[in-house]
């Protein structure tokens, strides 16, 4: 796994501020997740590795990993 630079993490934080709404586009293999493309959620925070943590409307909380998972603003 390649971690993003500090500049990229800052850009991710600016793109996905806490409280913004996102839609799941795709995610890496996770046999325990019931999330599907199109699911919506609210960003809680972005950590130092660029992982965007989301409280999903389905009731789960899951981090979207930089370079593996894809979300978009709604």
What residue ranges belong to the model's regions?
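Basic/aromatic-rich interaction segments and small domains that mediate binding to polyanionic partners
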Residues: 2-74
């Amino acid at each position: 796994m390649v971690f993003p630079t500090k500049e990229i993490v800052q850009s991710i934080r600016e793109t996905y501020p806490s409280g913004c709404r996102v839609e799941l586009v795709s995610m890496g293999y996770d046999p325990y997740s019931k999330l599907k493309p199109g699911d919506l959620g609210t960003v809680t925070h972005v950590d130092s590795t660029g992982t965007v943590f989301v409280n999903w409307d389905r009731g789960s909380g899951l981090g979207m990993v930089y370079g593996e998972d894809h979300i978009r603003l709604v």
